[in-house]
A protein has these predicted regions:
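Glycine/small-residue-rich loop that forms an oxyanion/phosphate-binding "nest" at active or ligand-binding sites
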Residues: 71-100, 107
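Glycine-rich, flexible N-terminal cofactor/catalytic loop recognition
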Residues: 6-75, 194, 204, 212-213, ...
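A polyampholytic, Gly/Pro-enriched intrinsically disordered region
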Residues: 90-98, 154-166, 223-233
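General beta-strand structural signal in soluble alpha/beta enzymes
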Residues: 45, 72, 107-109, 135-140, ...
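Conserved Motif II region of HX4D acyltransferases
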Residues: 98-120
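Gly/Ser/Thr-rich loops at beta-strand to alpha-helix junctions
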Residues: 25, 50-51, 111-118, 141-143, ...
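Class I SAM-dependent methyltransferase SAM-binding "motif I" and its flanking Rossmann-like core
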Residues: 115-176, 225
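A contiguous loop/helix-start segment that scaffolds small-molecule binding in enzyme catalytic cores
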Residues: 16, 174-239
Length: 239
């Protein structure tokens, strides 16, 4: 086999992994995720300028070989879609460059890669240029599942629906459903409290699930909280 054929085989064998590392507790990472991390050449870590350390990397690093290469990918904290698209494209280009060299890349994500993750946007860019065999999405335990488990809270039972909202927009429309999960509630907690007072719903506030500073507790509709940590969610169950 000549050197060109060997190089082509190396490139075609390179894989792109979306690795869900769970909510924060290193014990809640899956065996498949550990297998991949132990063999990977490049770890891709999404970070905003505001972040000093990546929580996902803190979870994953104990499972990675000492010589693994870290590729930090800047993801701006903005709602400007043109800026976000440029950042996603830049990240996808860097990942593809590594794969062209024959290196497999693992993109880390808190929780599960398929739920409100930057990985999904990179996937839409890379799927058309990679073969199906070169992509593997490794599921992870979500913060909402871990929070519910911590307090023995059934997310849904029987034929009940479960509604997941990325914020509180349109909350009134969904209050007819028995089970709700509200993500990204940090700045909207006063409105959530107001709605629980109106509807009498049971609520659990979960902050930094599985991480240092974890706080999971029943939310008292009468208390006054203006803002909580960015990594917070609310589980709601209508009475």
């Amino acid at each position: 086999m000549n050197s060109n054929n060997r190089e082509e085989q190396k490139v075609s064998a390179a894989k792109f992994y979306g690795v869900g590392v769970g909510p924060g507790d290193p014990k809640l990472i899956t065996l498949r995720a550990v297998e991949v991390l132990q063999e990977i050449e490049v770890i891709a870590i999404p970070k905003s300028k505001m972040e000093r350390e990546s929580i996902a990397w803190e979870i994953a690093k104990t499972h990675c070989p000492s010589g693994v290469r870290i590729m930090e990918l800047e993801m701006p904290m903005t709602s400007d879609e043109s800026i976000l698209r440029a950042a996603w494209q830049s990240a996808a280009d860097k990942i593809q460059d590594e794969m062209q060299k024959g290196n497999s890349v693992a993109f880390l994500t808190l929780g599960d890669p398929s739920l409100y993750s930057t990985y999904s946007y990179l996937l839409t860019i890379l799927e058309p240029v990679l073969s199906p065999e070169q992509i593997e999405t490794i599921p992870g335990i979500t913060a909402m599942a871990a929070a519910a488990a911590r307090v023995n809270w059934p997310l849904a039972t029987g034929d009940e629906p479960l509604v997941i909202l990325p914020g509180i927009e349109g909350l009134e429309e969904y209050e007819k459903y028995p089970n709700l999960v509200l993500m990204k509630v940090s700045r909207n907690l006063p409105e959530v409290l107001k709605r629980t007072q109106t509807t009498g719903a049971q609520a659990i506030l979960a902050t930094r699930v599985g991480q240092a500073g974890e706080n999971i507790r029943v939310l008292d509709a009468q208390e006054e909280l203006e803002k909580v940590d960015y990594l917070s969610l609310v589980l709601l169950k209508q009475k």
